[in-house]
Amino acid sequence: MVLVVLVIVAAGGFALHSGLDFFEDISGADASEERSLYRSANLEPALAALREEVGPRMRVDLKIEQRSLKANASVPERGDLLVVVTADGDVVDTSTGAGAEDAPRLRAVSADAVEKIADAVVRRADIALEDIAYFSMDTSKRPAWNVYLDGGGVWAAGLDGSDLRRSL
């Protein structure tokens, strides 16, 4: 009972923070390096599908997992959306989201920067790519990425991959 309550409280805390944890990594697929969205060749089709769904100039708050991409976006005429895209570039869900008025525009997100950050975290933390739980956009100050590790710990970097540092 206590464990269940702790899990619910922990999960709820992040969901309230970002609104992007509503959907789990929906693919259920193995997070192998060659299929990981932390690789630019795999992330770019997912970003392209997202651009097509919401437009490249829309502001987005992103969460990138090994096999899925989730975005809160504020889209004129459609309102605030939560869009989920698989690693194959398929839009699998679009529902009401939390909005992203203070987030960067989608065109500012670089698949190459995500791969650069992932490679640097793997090297500096001495982990495997599969040990990265997810990337989450931090829009509280200047746009940046927070990189959460499965075993605990958080790394932070600029949206372009600069200034990588251990955060927690």
Task: Describe each PLM feature range.
Residues 19-81:
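Extracytoplasmic low-complexity, Pro/Thr/Ser/Ala/Gly-rich segments
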Residues 19-34, 88-104:
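Acidic/histidine-rich, surface-exposed loop or edge segments in extracytoplasmic proteins
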